[in-house]
């Protein structure tokens, strides 16, 4: 087997392992403030891909496995592809990327305090301060 094929296999294995670890950690859910109106999955994808500004997206850190899982399930793109989209949008002055917060508690706090904010966390982290608007399985 060539070195390139081994590298590709290693990358694919790492990607699958990353998605599996997020899935094993728990179901990822999209949340908004308790009284907010739930948008469609398409609107959520558009917000996180910079195509819509009707909501304020919140992001978990790049190191959080739920982030990769969320982007794959919500936008059909991996986190690196989404990062490239936001690099282009930022460079051309057309927008700012989602606000990156430290952890699920920070996402819940931001979402609960702003009816236009949207974020994603593990289902196990949901409490009465936020409303689940979409489950990603």
Residue ranges and their predicted role:
Residues 2-12:
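Bacterial N-terminal signal peptides that target proteins for export
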Residues 11-12, 22, 116:
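Hydrophobic alpha-helical segments
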């Amino acid at each position: 087997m060539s070195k390139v094929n081994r590298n590709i296999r290693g990358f694919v294995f790492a990607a699958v392992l990353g998605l599996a670890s997020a899935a094993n950690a728990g179901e990822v859910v999209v949340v908004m403030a308790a009284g907010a109106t739930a948008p469609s999955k398409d609107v959520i994808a558009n917000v996180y891909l910079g195509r819509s500004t009707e909501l304020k997206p919140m992001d978990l850190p790049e190191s959080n496995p739920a982030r990769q899982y969320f982007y794959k399930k919500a936008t059909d793109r991996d986190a690196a592809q989404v990062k490239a989209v936001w690099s282009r949008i930022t460079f051309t002055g057309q927008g700012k990327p989602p606000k990156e917060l430290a952890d699920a508690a920070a996402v819940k706090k931001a979402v609960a305090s702003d009816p236009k904010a949207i974020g994603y966390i593990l289902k196990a982290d949901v409490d009465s301060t936020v409303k689940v608007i979409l489950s990603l399985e």
